[in-house]
A protein has these predicted regions:
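A structural motif
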Residues: 46-72, 111-120, 150, 154
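A solvent-exposed, charged loop/short amphipathic helix patch at secondary-structure junctions
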Residues: 63-83, 125
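A short acidic, glycine-rich active-site loop
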Residues: 76-86, 130-136
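Metal-dependent phosphoester-hydrolase catalytic domains
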Residues: 98-108, 116-234
Length: 234
């Protein structure tokens, strides 16, 4: 695919890869601290400006579709902490610390399948919408990203989750026996003084179905939707 488009390509692992229309000038892996199955990245040259781009995958369990929204906030968070996502994101943020210190001169974009909701979506305003079951939840992974200085590009550009929740998962709910939430678990975060999101949209589709994009029909190859964010470098 990369060769046919004339793109640069980095295979981080059999789970993660990065395609870039801009030259890749450096690759990053932190295998001693976090598996390349979960995280890795590159530095690209955007018309003479370096940008660090990272791809992320956090574990899919516990399954967000089964979040016990009828329980208390404390019980929901205890359920979430039974998995490894919180541990994984803190390992990732730990290895990124030297690069985060340079983010104002070399901006960072960090995207991927985080397999967990965002506290920016599970608010007082949405508690009785989207099958949230009355729950308002400070999901730990998105809180950790925010505390590390990252901005959620989609929610920054679409600040009202009531008007635009942004769905990247579970378009296939009709195939399930019980009603399931369709929610946002894929994100593009960014950080740095010289980068600014100027547009962001979530596109929702299902594996194997036809997807129409920019007037063309495509076979859709993923069980997730995707986020498309546009950035301006200053």
């Amino acid at each position: 695919v990369a060769d046919s488009l004339g793109y640069s390509y980095n295979l981080i692992s059999d789970n993660l890869s990065i395609y870039s229309r801009y030259p890749i000038i450096r690759k990053y892996a932190f295998a001693d601290s976090i598996s390349t199955f979960n995280f890795g990245g590159v530095m690209i040259d955007v018309d003479g400006k370096p940008v660090r781009v990272f791809n992320t995958w956090l574990h899919y369990l516990p399954d967000m579709r089964l979040a016990p929204t009828d329980k208390s906030k404390e019980e929901i968070l205890a359920w979430e902490m039974e998995g490894t996502r919180d541990e994984e994101i803190h390992k990732i943020l730990s290895v990124l610390q030297p690069l985060l210190a340079e983010a104002d001169s070399i901006p960072i974009i960090m995207g991927g399948d985080f397999n967990v909701h965002s506290h920016l979506d599970w608010t007082e305003a949405t508690r009785n919408l989207y099958l949230h079951g009355g729950a308002v939840v400070d999901w730990p992974v998105s809180i950790a990203m925010e505390e590390a200085g990252f901005k959620d590009s989609f929610r920054e550009m679409n600040p009202n989750p009531v008007a635009n929740l942004g769905v990247t998962w579970l378009t296939d709910a009709d195939s399930l026996e019980t009603e399931c939430r369709m929610d946002r678990i894929d994100f593009i975060y960014y950080q740095g003084k010289t980068i600014q999101a100027i547009a962001s949209e979530c596109y929702d589709n299902s594996l194997g179905k036809t997807f129409t994009f920019k007037g063309e029909d495509f076979f859709y190859p993923s069980d997730h939707g995707f986020v498309l964010s546009k950035f301006e470098l200053k």
